[in-house]
C-alpha cells in the first residue's frame, strides 16, 4: 500500500477568465484530484499578475495554488490532464514532505 505525500501545485492560467470562470475551472480540477483519491485539497487564487516575459503571447496570467495529499502514482495522470488544457500556460508540482534529517 502506498503512502500519501503532501504536494503543492502552482498553475499559471491565461488571463481570459473572470472570477466565476476561474472558480469553476479550479473546482473542476479539485474534483478531478478527488477522483484520484487526493485528500486535504485546498485551492487558493493568487490573482491576476503581469508576467516577467511573454508566455504563448500572454503578458498577464491568473495564478492558482492547489495544495493536496495524494499517492505519487496519480500525480502523473493529473499533470498530463493539465498539459492538454489550452488555458494552462505553465504549472509546477512540488513535493512538500519534509525529508530534512536533524542532527
Swiss-Prot record:
The keyword RNA-binding applies. One of its GO terms (biological process) is translation. Keywords: Chloroplast, Plastid, Ribonucleoprotein, Ribosomal protein, RNA-binding, rRNA-binding. One of its GO terms (cellular component) is ribonucleoprotein complex. It is found in: Plastid, Chloroplast. Its main location: plastid. Belongs to the bacterial ribosomal protein bS6 family. This is Small ribosomal subunit protein bS6c. It comes from Thalassiosira pseudonana. The lineage of its organism: Eukaryota, Sar, Stramenopiles, Ochrophyta, Bacillariophyta.
Amino acid at each position: 500500500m502506498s503512502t500519501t505525500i503532501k504536494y503543492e501545485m502552482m498553475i499559471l492560467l491565461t488571463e481570459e477568465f473572470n472570477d466565476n470562470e476561474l472558480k469553476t475551472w479550479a473546482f473542476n480540477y479539485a474534483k478531478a484530484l478527488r477522483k484520484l483519491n487526493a485528500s486535504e485539497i485546498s485551492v487558493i487564487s493568487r490573482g491576476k499578475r503581469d508576467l516577467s516575459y511573454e508566455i504563448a503571447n500572454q503578458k498577464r496570467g491568473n495564478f492558482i495554488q492547489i495544495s493536496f495529499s495524494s499517492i505519487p502514482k496519480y500525480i502523473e495522470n493529473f499533470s498530463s490532464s493539465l498539459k492538454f488544457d489550452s488555458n494552462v500556460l505553465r504549472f509546477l508540482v512540488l513535493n512538500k514532505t519534509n525529508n530534512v534529517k536533524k542532527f
